[in-house]
């Protein structure tokens, strides 16, 4: 697995296939957004798309084998900078993005802060805020407990600053203000979520607000997967080729 080293930050990623490039942003929240997590997802884009795309799957900072110091300035922009740095390391200027769970929040940060880099985005059950901040706090605290021993540099202020920057807002989709959703011009395919961390309201309101977004409501059950995968294939062939 290649490693991008930038000062104290090390980012590990893997590549497979050939064709138009796609960056894959894995599910699993802060604790598990790493390349290998895709193997446990209802649909694994590494396997499904690498026959016709050059796919890049990365371990986000402080998951898997990637590392970065914890600071009070950490937030969605920190992750976006990492993701763009990986694509820069590969010499890729423009690319599509496929993300699941927290990957949806990562994508929305990318398409608002670097829209010229992203030609298409698939968001599978994006995380959202609908009366569930306590549940996200519990996930954050578990992540901190898991990695805290590896971060003697981090003070309580650093951890709380990181929490606030990520999950302290009232944004429906966490990473971007609701008012910015109608300004997103990137073509997006949204596969609806349906649980406490991925509320369907978040998917529905994103698809309604963003002018070039399309919603797929049913996709996870085995009976629905062939049609949903075909829709993803058509979408990527149209916009990420």
Regions found by a protein language model. Give the residues of each.
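Conserved HGGG/HGGXW glycine-rich cap/lid loop of the alpha/beta-hydrolase fold
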Residues: 6-67
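Short beta-to-alpha linker loops that shape the active-site pocket of alpha/beta-hydrolase fold enzymes
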Residues: 59-63, 127, 219-221
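Catalytic active-site module of serine/aspartate enzymes centered on a nucleophile-bearing elbow/loop
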Residues: 213-241
